[in-house]
Regions:
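Cytochrome P450
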Residues: 1-424
Length: 424
């Protein structure tokens, strides 16, 4: 499949060309994991065709090892909940479509099988209890108010930088009890840890390695401080004072730290940005929300479905098995495309429409299912809910005034920039 460099054309024409190419390309040449499709936002017809014609598809036409694409909701659920057959172990390649690069095998509980997975995951769970979320809600609201009150009026600015990154970075600094003045390091490390070389985030694998080494050195210092001090209410301290994680080797420590940084950054940050874009692309839904702010409660999970901030998760087959009538061999990589399952026509009514009062909005796949379901999903929902409550109180409308710039990745489905303007 030949993906051309993006051309400056309007969205409707871009999608027309993408649909034409997707339906003209032989299925044997499909590579739905090509990052360019996600950066150009032209992935949709490719996955639409797979759902219709070959919902379990084997790709051999890619610059990476062959992989299975699982694109329908129920098939994805089957893979996601059968952890005895489908492994996320980093030693087998990890959780993304590309194998873990040599020297980057940092095992984390999301890239572990049982019983180690649950033992380590339970260590950080107290941070996300309903009681603790109630405590965090006050802080989230105060910070949202401060950030929003300082936004310019009648002036174009980057919503990603001024709002999404700033609010998620502040929360990460709180969760880790990280030095406040250096909090932007956390989102930088998150971006670098998932970036491809020449993606615009890092120029080379060597640059990525240098920055990850910096992350390791910095977080190791904080870790040693937590180990040698009384327990505190932050993620590092929870791990430092629990027997399941206290004696982690350095790679396991680094893996869990990166997991928690990325998890706390990408879902909220990119869905927050995506919500502004979705409401601008669907002005009748924006009007509906402004007329009835109580719809925030259903709008939040709907925009998480709509955005799908983590486009896929990968597993490795531990034995010969079958998905959708296709024979999967032991050792095969199996990619669950959440971004496609969330648009499955057999699961969702009008799946390509953004409907803020959609019935049963939490049936989306964006947080995964089974033992690896996102541990911080309620915190992500809470942050999105509060920021929209505060935005609706302050602004009649936030207007998108230019095309977003999307990340070059088929793993993190997010944004670098979203130019907006607040009238008034």
């Amino acid at each position: 499949m030949n993906i051309q460099a993006p051309v400056k054309v309007d969205k409707a024409e871009r999608m027309r060309r993408a649909r034409e190419e997707a339906y003209a390309t032989p299925l044997s040449q499909f590579h739905p994991g090509a990052p360019r499709l996600f950066q150009d936002d032209t992935l949709w017809p490719w996955f639409e065709r797979l759902r219709k014609e070959e919902p379990v598809h084997y790709c051999t036409n890619a610059p990476i090892e062959p992989y299975w694409s699982v694109v329908k909701y129920n098939d994805i659920m089957h893979v996601d909940t059968n952890h005895g057959i489908f492994s996320s172990d980093s030693k087998l390649g990890g959780i993304s479509i590309r194998d873990v690069p040599e020297g980057y095998d940092y095992p984390s509980f999301i890239a572990m099988d049982q019983p180690r997975h649950s033992a380590q995951r339970k260590t950080v769970s107290p941070m996300f209890t309903p009681q603790h979320l109630d405590e965090l809600a006050k802080l989230i609201r105060q910070r949202s108010q401060t950030v929003l009150d300082n936004l310019p009026r009648n002036e174009t600015f980057n919503f990603v930088e001024r709002v999404s990154i700033e609010l998620t970075t502040q929360m990460l600094a709180t969760l880790f009890d990280f030095p406040w003045e250096e909090r932007r390091k956390l989102t930088r490390w998150s971006d670098v840890s998932t970036a491809l070389p020449k993606s615009g985030i890092v120029a080379s694998a060597e640059e990525r390695r240098r920055e990850m080494d910096e992350c390791y050195a910095y977080m190791s210092k904080l870790w040693n401080e937590r180990v040698n001090s009384a327990p505190r209410n932050d993620l590092l301290s929870l791990m430092a004072h629990n027997e399941a994680t206290r004696h982690m080797d350095p790679d396991n420590l680094m893996g869990n730290i990166i997991l928690l940084i990325v998890g706390g950054n990408d879902t909220t940050r990119n869905t927050m940005t995506g919500s502004v874009l979705a409401l601008n692309e669907n002005p009748e839904q924006y009007d509906k929300l402004r007329a009835n702010p109580e719809l925030i409660d259903t709008m939040v999970p709907e925009v998480i479905r709509w955005q799908t901030p983590l486009a896929h998760m990968r597993r490795t087959a531990l034995q010969d098995t079958e998905i959708g009538g296709k024979h999967i061999r032991k050792g095969d990589r199996v990619v669950m495309w959440y971004v496609s399952g969330n648009r499955d026509e057999e699961m969702f009514d009008k799946p390509n429409e953004f409907i803020i009062d959609r019935p049963r909005p939490r049936t989306h796949l964006s947080f995964g299912f089974g033992i690896h379901r996102c541990v911080g999903m309620r915190l992500a929902e809470l942050q999105l809910k509060i920021v929209w409550e505060e935005m609706l109180q302050r602004f009649d409308r936030i207007e998108v005034v230019g095309e977003p710039k999307r990340i070059y990745s088929s793993f993190i489905k997010g944004y670098e920039t979203l130019p907006v303007r607040i009238p008034g």
